[in-house]
Amino acid sequence: MLRRLLLVMAMMAGSLALFATLAPAAQAAEPLRMASLAPVAPVMPCADLAKLDLAGATGAPTTFTATEVAGAKPYCQVSGTIARANRFEVRLPLGGWTQRFLQTGCGGLCGSLRIDPGKAEGCTPVTDGSIVLASTDMGHSGNGSEWGENADQRTDFAYRGVHVTTLAAKALIKAFYGQAQRYAYFSGCSDGGREALMEAQRYPQDFDGIAAGAPALNFTVQNSFHHGWLAKQNTGADGKPVLTWPDMVPLHAAVLKSCDGLDGLVDGQITDPRLCRFDPAVILCKAAYEAGKCLTATQVAVVRKIYDGARSAKGTKLEIGAEMPGSEMEWRSGFVPSTRDGRIGSEMFMTSTVNALMFTPNPKTPYSSATMPFTEAFYAAGEPARKLYSADDADISRFLAHGKLLLWHGWADPHISPMNSIDYYARVGLKAGTAQRDAAMRLFLFPGMGHCSGGDGPSEFPLLANLMAWVESGKAPGRMVAARAGQTAEGLPVGIRGAGPNGPGAGGPPLAGPGGPGGPAGPGGVQAARQGPPPGMMPPKEVLPPRSRPIFAYPQVARYSGKGSVDDAASFVAATPAPTKDVAVWIGASR
């Protein structure tokens, strides 16, 4: 019951070198204030929108239909295709439009239409249906990568699909309401986060406010070296996984025992995993291996390589960041299957990109994690693809001159290391200058959060409300309060533990698409790539208590004030850590 003990203990460790200064006691946050905009009614019937010619706006032949959708929040639904094959959808309120437009990104390799304004707590324009919504499938159907042979579809996925959908949506807004939107927003996570940054970099005038969550900004590296390394390390000589789900229980408990208290509080989550110096040898089996109790010498070696990240034989770091200490319970969603007969999702993530999207022409002999070269030369060979897909250009001065950017990431993200976001934030400061960056950009890091949501830590927060309030009232968010409802110890909501061999997931890994391998409802009826333990292999059925925690704008962190419940945000104050070197040293650092 170590996990339960760790979660209920709360202690102060005195003055830690981690913190340079402490802010005064936290006070109630000011209410978020958005602009008061007069509701606007349509100036034409919904059906008449279908008579418009959008080719002039999108720059390509565009076909679409327009249909009224009844309900508590009725809207005009426009569904269409922008040549070559960008399917898009726009929802325009039939009454009470408050002059705002929100476009949402897609996850994985996209391939389906799903408007998902997530993290909308407290965002009235979204919750009351008074905002125009739009999204695109990024130019192809299905979450596979078979379309990768087509150069136009590669470009659509890389950046064009989002942009032309934006152009179409804005043209529809102007025609339907007789005026343009007052504010335009974009929000996405995972690949949607990459899409968000791509908009800021390539089309800085498209949006006034952008929220980029866990962005797959180093797309080619992420889906070649990162996932390839994870798959290779966790595949034994017999072709079976070295680590399986039961091994995560003692590993994660040992990490928490070693590093949970570094911030002065033992609360079941690690505030800054960069400070954790953990050696998995502390749980090396002293006798025979027993699943769920200890690790073999081989498993210890694999865990060390997983924490270290992809390297060449010369020792060159081939990626910005690897798995962070404290993320172990999230590894099931990519490269640690439930049993030794399970598949390693990271293998599929890697092969989908390397064999279908990275090279022209595609490799004659497909790569696997066992045959893909982890070399400097292979990184160089992927440069053309990096320039196409990756949203790693830190020169976003044109966007920052008028817009606002919220960058956010979970510290326990197993698919995209939060070190990518930290590095990008630092490089924007070098390019634009810290004054311009700090006036228009914020980074928020969430302890214990997995990929886009979930995990041990609080992961639901008013993202869109904060973004809109910043853009419309000019008040930058200094903190956001994140919440965690009651959930099981592996980060799943209460009531769905044991739902099947493929546990429910949110956000989806970078190459799994909305439904993971197997489509919108994968083999387990949910996201197949986000594997959870099957019945009979669960950790003890403990329930983590509801928790709220302030998340302060980077580099500040939350520190327990010494009074009140550790599950109450009011018990925490802002602390400024000692400075860290945030620009990563790796093979791509010179770009």
Task: Label the predicted regions.
Residues V8-T21:
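Bacterial N-terminal signal peptides
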Residues A28-R100, T104, S112-E121, H252, ...:
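Catalytic-loop region of hydrolases
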Residues M198-A200, Q205-R311, L445, S459, ...:
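A catalytic-pocket lid/entrance helix-loop region that shapes and gates access to the active site
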Residues G107-G178, S224-F225, K232, P366-L388, ...:
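Cap/lid segment of the alpha/beta-hydrolase catalytic domain
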